[in-house]
Amino acid sequence: MSDNPFRSGFVSIIGRPNVGKSTLLNRILGEKIVITSDKPQTTRNRIQGIHNVPGAQIVFIDTPGIHQARSRLNKYMVEVALSAIREVDLVLFLVEANQKPGEQEQEIIDVLAGATAPVFLVINKVDLTEKGAVLERIAAYKDRYPFREIVPISAGTGDGVDHLVELVRKALPQGPVYFPDDILTDVPERFIAAEIIREKVFRMTRDEVPYATAVEVDSFKEREDGGLVSIAATITVERDSQKGIIIGKKGAMLKKIGSAARVEIEKLLNTKVFLELFVRVRKDWSEDERMLKELGYT
């Protein structure tokens, strides 16, 4: 047997909403595959990012934030996150250095008590927090759970992230190569394109509008000469008033969303993109199980 066996495994990144889970995954991969915003509950689906290092393949799983779920959509999101705890080789519990452990963190710790995989506590945003406060956080969490490792990082600047990845590599079991080494994620490009459009809605609208929005890519066609990708997508909202906000005065907001999304999709695909957006109303879709399935939340 080799003295340095190949290691591989699945690693879930969990935490309450808006602690930097998606930012951390994008930082590790060196590419943006997961959308981000300053609003909580941006991530809705389980997304896998594949990171290859010498002697190992790490499959990171970005999850929705764990929170009190009221709508059917939110309950789906929480179940996605909880299932990612049960099915992995390692759990990264991400918290913020500038926030004391509260009720949400304790609820997650209570869930972790039933986890069979080891758990790392990853303390994010240390660049925005005084060292004394970081040490206080470490002590507070140590009293609550027997974490395998406690790792301070900044997903925003990258500080400590390489060290975290090395600790993750060492903690994984021996295993096979799950994905080809040129694969960055298991989700298709059309899914990422839809997520980019939804991200722009999150960033450019306010109040309930982002949370009432879903995006479907209706068509994704590549020209035979490879010179252009034509994408048609539908933005679904729950109210006529929300549709009006998305479209904006004389279509200005929809044009702004489409323009920003197109630029980012072109970077993703490394080609020119023609993007056409439509807006429709499906009343209370986030509470309707049939519509949730149609929109991909299953």
From Swiss-Prot:
| Stretches for region G1 | 15-22
How this chain sits in the membrane, per its record, is: Peripheral membrane protein
One of the protein's GO biological processes: ribosomal small subunit assembly
InterPro entries linked to this entry: G_ERA_dom, GTP-bd, GTPase_Era-like, KH_dom-like_a/b, KH_dom_type_2, KH_sf_prok-type, P-loop_NTPase, Small_GTP-bd
Give its localization.
Cytoplasm; Cell inner membrane
Query: Boundaries of each Era-type G domain copy?
Result: 7-174
Region of interest called G2, as start-end residue ranges on this chain: 41-45
- What Gene Ontology molecular function terms does this protein carry? GTP binding; GTPase activity; ribosomal small subunit binding; small ribosomal subunit rRNA binding
Start and end residues of each stretch annotated as G5: 153-155
According to the UniProt entry, the coiled-coil residues are none
Q: Which parts of the sequence belong to the KH type-2 domain? A: 205-283
Q: Which UniProt keywords apply?
A: Cell inner membrane, Cell membrane, Cytoplasm, GTP-binding, Membrane, Nucleotide-binding, Ribosome biogenesis, RNA-binding, rRNA-binding
Using the UniProt annotation, give all residue ranges assigned to the region (G4). 124-127
Q: Where is this region: G3?
A: 62-65
Please give the superkingdom of this protein's source: Bacteria
Provide one Gene Ontology cellular component. plasma membrane
Question: Quaternary form?
Answer: Monomer.
Which NCBIfam families does this UniProt record tie to the protein? era (TIGR00436), PRK00089.1 (NF000908), small_GTP (TIGR00231)
Q: Which PANTHER family match?
A: GTPASE ERA, GTPASE ERA, MITOCHONDRIAL
Task: State the family named in the UniProt similarity comment for this chain.
Answer: Belongs to the TRAFAC class TrmE-Era-EngA-EngB-Septin-like GTPase superfamily. Era GTPase family.
HAMAP family in UniProt? GTPase_Era
Q: Function, please? A: An essential GTPase that binds both GDP and GTP, with rapid nucleotide exchange. Plays a role in 16S rRNA processing and 30S ribosomal subunit biogenesis and possibly also in cell cycle regulation and energy metabolism.
Q: What is this protein called?
A: GTPase Era
